[in-house]
């Protein structure tokens, strides 16, 4: 069966690329100050460390989202309107990542740290919900899926995204009281997704998915 999702995937890859570019634009070169030397520049750069950390974790998160998006579309061969809108919701939310990342970079060392982390983790709750919606739309009509995909494979992939929701939601709730812990939970989840893979058995039995 010929895949009907090539244009969706190409458009999605473009949006992911733009989202990463927006992150980079938040990395500002310090203003030149009269008389500054290498030691002074190093001090200025050290003061900017929240911005670098925010960029790194946000880039990593978008990369993990892109990997999951790529692998889920390996199992989707056809499209309908509901699936395209669900995918559009994912892209919309991913394109917003740069904004809470900028908030995190600017306010992490201030008294507003808690709110910046809450906004950041809240966005990823929504992104996870959008992924679950995408897979629900894909599996509601199995004719959209890859030929030969088993019910067990569908269930495994669904569960793979479902457990992300309570984890993100936990991080979101914790962020109101322990923002550092909330960020750590998100990072650990992304690391887990990056390192783990599940074997989903199709007719050829060779496919792996995160």
Model segments located where?
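Multi-pass alpha-helical transmembrane bundle typical of ion/small-solute transporters
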Residues: 1-210
